[in-house]
Amino acid sequence: PAVMATRALENQRDRLKTILITPFMSCSARLTIYVLLADMFFPKSAMLVAYSLYLVGVAMAILIALIVHRMTDNKTENALLIELPEYKIPNLRTVAIYVWEKIKDYLTKAGTTIFLASIILWFVMNVGPAGFISDVADSFAAKFGQILVPVLKPVGLGSWQIAVALISGISAKEVVVSSMSVLYGIGNINSAAGMAELSGILGGTGFTSVNAYALMVFCLLYTPCIATIATIKRETQSWRWTLGMVMFQLVLAWSAAFLVFQIGSRLF
């Protein structure tokens, strides 16, 4: 909805700038990641840590907006004037038709992209070189996750399980938590015992509070979910712009997590 709301901006350049920074605002799906990791690794200040991620997102959006503003030609200024109509009781039939048209438009355009991407993600998570698998460790996703380990190691996320969880998070950010639960063999991540077990497993691999915060920062800034990507494609009418945004967010997420991990490791 936030991306689609940019239609109210008359200038195409302003729309693209707004679409670029909108994904940096934390959604409710990311909150599940913050709550889980903050509660496990920052038990005394979990709420402050979770709130800090929201502030990081806002600060990053402002910074990127300022940089883009200075890099582009801004000679033309547009005053956003919206004529407010007279308030009236809406006609239910008119509202129903309007809502149906929007839903149909979304399902036929953005929904198609979401469906295809979901099939691809399901395939790589459930199929491996030997065919259909019962253990995710044998899947194509796990193989790809192992390839990503050297890339993610400098940011403190050097395990294939975390890499696969991040890949699955492209479908929906809350899936990162459930994927980590499955990949690390946790029965019920929503219980105190499950969280303690996952914390113990991660701690045994050298995963500290610094790694946890780096992971939260990465989840905040990296590629948004499929639905958002599809909506961006629909609003910009450009795969080049959409894929460019995805790559930019990946690089930004890696860079920010790198700074957090490297600086944090030296200070704590």
Positions of PLM-derived features:
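Membrane-embedded alpha-helical segments of transport systems
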Residues: 1, 20-35, 52-61, 171-177, ...
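Extended, low-charge hydrophobic alpha-helical regions
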Residues: 2-16, 119-250
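Small-residue-enriched core segments of transmembrane alpha-helices in multipass membrane transport
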Residues: 23-26, 41-42, 48-64, 135-153, ...
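Juxtamembrane inter-helical linkers in multi-pass membrane proteins
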Residues: 1, 74-98, 141-143, 184-197
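Long hydrophobic segments that form regular secondary structure
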Residues: 48, 74-77, 87-132, 139, ...
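Transmembrane helix-loop junctions at the membrane interface of multipass transporters and ion channels
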Residues: 24, 28-51, 227-238, 259-268
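Juxtamembrane/interface segments at transmembrane-helix termini
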Residues: 65-79, 129-135, 265-268
